[in-house]
């Protein structure tokens, strides 16, 4: 008997779901949200049970990888229990989480026990003052303690996510690599994505391409192309000096990955986003609440939504913004 498969109209298989469990965060990163952010009312967001119901239907339809995101997922009460329920879904191969690391010193071990298979941890600077400037509220030492707690808990192939910005942290690229090598961490260097209008931050001035990142790395290390894949948008390389770790590049501007896109996103409001860089969406919360106890209705809405998935995004790296929602409203 063949496995169920979700397909879009371009015959791309969709088997990766990113789910935002909250729009709230204890950081205010300059590329993610405005400093004075207004968050969604509690009644407007999905309950943990509703998030689990959506995950259950996606896995029944062939999804093999789920990533929980935010905002910061670990500030939502009950998220460890949610992880345990999702990890137990028959057929799911990977349950991952993207986090800023601020809560991992106390939650890494419970997450590992709950069945989370991999962590991505955001880290854009190793300088405490610059880290504070970029996150507006973050404590670098607490994040590093969280990274060490993840290693101690048993997580492997933990990945650092670094958004590289010209004039802000591009000079730290090789220092971040050295930090990753020392702790046996993978790294993804990410081109900034133009989501939401942030008046105090110019994306045109801060854009730094993946090609520029590789040039900077080549000043200290030897990059070797790799065929590794984690079912996500990263294109991976290895380092001759540290072959055990993977170096990824997420390049939505300079080398977009739309042609092989295999993922969709669920916002915490229950909108199923078919593309990070477009507003095509389906309101799954409305389906859940209009037809409780009828999972077949939710499945049909998911299947039908695949036909709305566009071929590609329309990102630019000037200050023009095609998508007005912030990254924390999207699920990073």
Swiss-Prot record:
Q: Which UniProt keywords apply?
A: 4Fe-4S, GTP-binding, Iron, Iron-sulfur, Lyase, Metal-binding, Molybdenum cofactor biosynthesis, Nucleotide-binding, S-adenosyl-L-methionine
- Which amino acids does the record list as binding [4Fe-4S] cluster 1? 25, 29, 32
Record-level GO BP terms: Mo-molybdopterin cofactor biosynthetic process
Q: How is the cofactor bound?
A: Binds 2 [4Fe-4S] clusters. Binds 1 [4Fe-4S] cluster coordinated with 3 cysteines and an exchangeable S-adenosyl-L-methionine and 1 [4Fe-4S] cluster coordinated with 3 cysteines and the GTP-derived substrate.
Quote the pathway field: Cofactor biosynthesis; molybdopterin biosynthesis
Which catalytic reaction applies to this protein? GTP + AH2 + S-adenosyl-L-methionine = (8S)-3',8-cyclo-7,8-dihydroguanosine 5'-triphosphate + 5'-deoxyadenosine + L-methionine + A + H(+)
Please state the Enzyme Commission number of this protein.
Answer: 4.1.99.22
Q: Which GO terms describe its molecular function?
A: 4 iron, 4 sulfur cluster binding; cyclic pyranopterin monophosphate synthase activity; GTP 3',8'-cyclase activity; GTP binding; metal ion binding; S-adenosyl-L-methionine binding
Essential cofactor(s): [4Fe-4S] cluster
Q: Where does [4Fe-4S] cluster 2 bind?
A: 258, 261, 275
Query: Which of this chain's residues are annotated to bind GTP?
Result: 18, 67, 98, 159, 263-265
Record domain Radical SAM core: where: 9-220
Binding annotation for S-adenosyl-L-methionine: 31, 71, 122, 193
Q: What top-level class of enzyme does the UniProt entry assign?
A: lyase
Describe its partners and assembly state: Monomer and homodimer.
Q: What does this protein do?
A: Catalyzes the cyclization of GTP to (8S)-3',8-cyclo-7,8-dihydroguanosine 5'-triphosphate.
Q: Which family does it belong to?
A: Belongs to the radical SAM superfamily. MoaA family.
- Protein name, UniProt field: GTP 3',8-cyclase
The organism named in the record is Pseudomonas syringae pv. tomato (strain ATCC BAA-871 / DC3000)
Gene behind the chain: moaA
């Amino acid at each position: 008997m063949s496995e169920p498969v979700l397909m879009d109209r371009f015959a791309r298989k969709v088997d990766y779901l990113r789910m935002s469990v909250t729009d709230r965060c204890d950081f205010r990163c300059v590329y993610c949200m405005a400093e004075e952010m207004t968050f969604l009312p509690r009644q407007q967001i999905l309950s943990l049970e509703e998030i689990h119901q959506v995950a259950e239907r996606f896995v029944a339809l062939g999804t093999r990888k789920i990533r929980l995101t935010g905002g910061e997922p670990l500030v939502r009460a009950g998220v460890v229990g949610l992880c345990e329920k999702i990890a137990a879904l028959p057929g799911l191969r990977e349950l991952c989480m993207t986090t800023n690391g601020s809560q991992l010193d106390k939650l890494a071990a419970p997450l590992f026990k709950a069945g989370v298979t991999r962590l991505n941890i955001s880290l854009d600077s190793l300088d405490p003052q610059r880290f504070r400037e970029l996150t507006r509220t973050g404590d670098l030492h607490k994040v590093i303690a969280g990274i060490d707690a993840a290693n101690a808990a048993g997580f492997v192939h933990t990945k650092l996510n670094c958004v590289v910005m010209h004039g802000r942290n591009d000079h730290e690229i090789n220092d971040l690599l050295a930090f990753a090598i020392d702790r046996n961490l993978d790294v993804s260097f990410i081109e900034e994505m133009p989501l939401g209008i942030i008046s105090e931050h110019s994306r045109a001035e801060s854009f730094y391409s993946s090609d520029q990142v590789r040039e900077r790395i080549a000043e200290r290390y030897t990059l070797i192309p790799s065929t590794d894949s984690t079912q996500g948008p990263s294109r991976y390389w290895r380092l001759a000096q540290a072959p055990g770790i993977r170096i990824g590049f997420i390049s939505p501007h300079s080398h977009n990955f739309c042609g092989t896109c295999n993922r969709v996103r669920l916002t915490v409001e229950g909108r199923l986003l078919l593309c990070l860089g477009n507003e095509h969406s389906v309101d799954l919360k409305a389906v859940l609440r209009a037809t409780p106890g009828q999972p077949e209705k939710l499945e049909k809405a998911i299947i039908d939504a695949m036909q709305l998935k566009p071929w590609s995004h329309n990102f630019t790296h000037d200050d023009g913004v095609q998508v007005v929602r912030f990254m924390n409203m999207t699920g990073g």
